[in-house]
Amino acid sequence: MSNIIKALEEEQLKSDLPKFAPGDTVVVKVKVKEGDRERLQAFEGVVIAIRNRGLHSAFTVRKISNGEGVERAFQTHSPMVDSIEVKRRGAVRRAKLYYLRERSGKSARIKEKLTKK
């Protein structure tokens, strides 16, 4: 029975997702239905948490909008998530960046990860 479930879940996994980690700044384009038409809405922010559970994987993105912190959780393999674009890699030493919720201003900044060429 579980082999059938695994096979069905593997069919629905997205393969075109970029590699991203906590601390990275990403732009998530989400399909939003308004009335009878559908459009893409971009949500740009810092990834503060990732939950890897196969088809049930999720990640949380945090941004500051009009001086107010906004967090949004996305299902990684959801059909509502159109695309994920990594804008900037962040150098952090934690898997969950919940401490950013209490920080504001310069203390909430994340250093950029230096990559070898």
From Swiss-Prot:
Keywords: Ribonucleoprotein, Ribosomal protein. GO terms for cellular component: cytosolic large ribosomal subunit. GO terms for biological process: translation. Pfam families: Ribosomal_L19. SUPFAM superfamilies: Translation proteins SH3-like domain. This protein is located at the 30S-50S ribosomal subunit interface and may play a role in the structure and function of the aminoacyl-tRNA binding site. This is Large ribosomal subunit protein bL19.
